[in-house]
C-alpha cells in the first residue's frame, strides 16, 4: 500500500524511497515486530481464557515437558496477523508472487488452526484426518504452483534449476506442478514437525526467511542475477519484503515463546510458515536450495519417517523418540542445549545455501 506513494515522487521527491525494496523490507520487519510485541499480551490472555487447559502435552514425552501443561497454543495467529498487516502495508499490491505466497500462507494457516482447534477441544494429539489434511494442503499448493508457473518467465516455466551447476535446467513438463506442490507441502509439514520445543522452530524459520529474502532479492534483480549467473526471475525481489515481515513477526513472537514459553505457535503457525518458505523457494526457482537452507527441517521430518518405517518393517526403533529433538532429550540433553545447538546448525546450513549463489 505504501508503495503506491512512490507514484507521487514526481511531486514530492522523498516519497521515491518507497520504491526501494530494501527500505520497505526494513519497514515491514519493524512494523510486524511492533504489532506482535504490542498486541501479543492481549492475544495470549484471550487464547488462555478460551482454551482453558491449553495444548495437550504428550504423556510419553520427556518428563520435563509436563510442566508446560496449560500453555495456550495457536500463537501462529500472532505471527500471521503481524506479518499479513505488514505485508499489505509495505509490498507492491500489483505483485503476483506476493498474493500467491499470501494465499498459501493463509490457506495452510487455516488448516493448522482447525487442527489446533480440534486438539484443544478434544484434549488430544489427534486433529482431523491426516489424509484429508494432506489433500487440502496439496490442493492449495497445487493451485499456487499453477499460478507461479503462469507468472514465471517463458524460459523458466516448469524448469528445475540446480545449485552450483551454471545454466543447468531440467524441464519437468507437466510433472513440475506436483513436484513444486510437494516442495511446499513438505516444507509446511517439516516445520510443523520441528515445532516441539520452546523457540526451536521460529528461529530457524527466521534464519531461512532471511536467507531466502536475500536470494529472492538477488534473483529478482537483473544486474545481480547476471553477475551471480543465476536465473533472473522478474518481480521475485518483492518477496524479500514478505520475508522481512515474517522475520519481524517472528522476533515479536520469540519474545513470548522464549523458555519458559508463554504460548506455542501450534500448527496454525508452523504449517503456515513452512508453506510460506516453500512457496518463496518455488517462485525464486531455488527449490533444491531450500533442502539445504532448511536442512534442519528435513532432518526432523526424515527422523519421523525413518522411525515409522523401521518400526513397521522390523518392530525396532532407530531413535529413542521421534522427532529427533526428543531423541537428544532422551539422551540427557537439556532443552536449551537442543534448541541452541539446532539453531547453530540452521545458521551453518543457511550460509551453505547462500554460498551456492556464488559457486558456479
Swiss-Prot record:
The keyword Cell inner membrane applies. Its cofactor is Mg(2+). Pathway: Cell wall biogenesis; peptidoglycan biosynthesis. The keyword Magnesium applies. One of its GO terms (cellular component) is plasma membrane. InterPro entries: Glycosyl_transferase_4, PNAcMuramoyl-5peptid_Trfase, PNAcMuramoyl-5peptid_Trfase_CS. Its main location: membrane. Pfam families: Glycos_transf_4, MraY_sig1. PROSITE patterns: MRAY_1 (PS01347), MRAY_2 (PS01348). It is found in: Cell inner membrane. Keywords: Cell cycle, Cell division, Cell inner membrane, Cell membrane, Cell shape, Cell wall biogenesis/degradation, Magnesium, Membrane, Metal-binding, Peptidoglycan synthesis, Transferase, Transmembrane, Transmembrane helix. Catalyzes the initial step of the lipid cycle reactions in the biosynthesis of the cell wall peptidoglycan: transfers peptidoglycan precursor phospho-MurNAc-pentapeptide from UDP-MurNAc-pentapeptide onto the lipid carrier undecaprenyl phosphate, yielding undecaprenyl-pyrophosphoryl-MurNAc-pentapeptide, known as lipid I. HAMAP family: MraY. This is Phospho-N-acetylmuramoyl-pentapeptide-transferase. It comes from Methylorubrum extorquens (strain CM4 / NCIMB 13688) (Methylobacterium extorquens). The lineage of its organism: Bacteria, Pseudomonadati, Pseudomonadota, Alphaproteobacteria, Hyphomicrobiales.
